[in-house]
Amino acid sequence: KAQEIAAELQSAFPKAEVIIMHAQFIMTDRAKREEQILKRVGKRSTPESRRGLIIVGTQVLEQSLDLDFDLMITELCPMDLLLQRTGRLHRHNRVRPQGLETASCFVLDETDDSFDSGSAAIYGEWLLMRTRALLPNKLTIPSDIPLLVQQTYDETNNEMLGELTEGMKKAQEENKLRTGKKRRSAENYLISKPSNKKGKCLDGWLDNDIKPNNEQTGEKAVRDGDPSVDVIALMRDREGLIRIIADKSETIIPADRPPSREEALLIARQKLRLPGFFGRRWKIDDTIEQLEAETQNVFSAWQDSALLKEEVVLLFDEDLNADLAGVQLHYDIKTGLTYEKE
C-alpha cells in the first residue's frame, strides 16, 4: 500500500522527491534509507535538504528515528500510536515553510462508519472506534496525551460512543478476545519468580520453557501477531553465480563451500523480512518448506557456518524476480519488495 501511495504522489507531484520507507527492504538497503531520511528530515536537516521532499512510510518510521516533519498525513490508528506519530511533527525548533507555521496532522478516515480493512485487521475495530470518537480537532502535546490514552483504553466508560450498536458490541467482544490472547501469550515469557535460596547467582534467571499450550511452541516471539519470516535475499545470475543484490555486478557469494567469517557477516546483512501473510497459519508451512528445500539444495555447505546454518535463502533471478509458495515477488532497491499473488 505504501508503494502504491508513493507512486501516486510521484505522479501527482512530478517535481517532488518521494522517498519510501517500510519493513520490506533488505537490511543493508534499509539502513542506507534510514540514514538518508535522517539526513534529509532529521534534527540537523537544512531547508535545502527538506525542500520538495515527501516521505511515505509505514510503522517503521515510528521506531527510534528522530524525524521532524513540516506536515503529516496519517491513517487512523489507536490513540497512543497516533499521538506517537504526531511526535514527529514540528519536533524541533526551526523556521517552517510558508503556510506550515502551525503543526497540522490530517487523519485519513472512511466517509461512513467503516474502517480501512488493513487497519482493522491490525488493530481491531474497537480501538479505532474509540479513537475516532475521542480524537479532538486540536491537540496540545504532551499535556493531552495521558487523558486521551486513558480514555481510549478505559473499558468502563463508553459514553463517547453513545448507545452501543450490535456492530460495536461485536467489535468490543473481538477486542476482549484479542486482548486475552495477547495476555495468555505474554504469560509464556514471564520471568520465573525469584527463589528464596541464598547464594543463587543470576545465571539461568531468564530461563523459562515455553508452555505446552503455546501455539508457537519453541519460538520465543518478541512481538504480538503471526510469526514473521526472515530470509537471506540473494541473486543468482544467468551464469548461475550467486551475488549480493545491492552490487549484483561485483560480489560473488560461495555456494559450494562454507563462507569465511567476513563473507558470512556480509551474507547475514542481506536479511529481508517477507510480507506478513507468509507467516499466516495457512501459508507458513508451504513457505518454510520451500525455503528450507532450496537452501539445502543450493547452500548445503553453509551448514558448517555458525552464522548461517539456521538461515534460509530466497534466491532472486537477475531481474530480481522470485517465486515463493505461489506468490510472484520482485525486489527493487528504491521501492523494496513487491508481490503479486497467483
Please give the residue ranges for each predicted region.
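C-terminal helicase lobe and adjacent C-terminal extensions/tails of nucleic-acid helicase motors
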Residues: 1-45, 69, 73-342
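Short amphipathic alpha-helical segments, especially helix-boundary/capping motifs
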Residues: 10-13, 59-63
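Conserved two-lobed SF2 helicase motor
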Residues: 47-62
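Flexible glycine/serine/alanine-rich "lid" or loop that lines and gates the nucleotide-sugar donor pocket
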Residues: 66
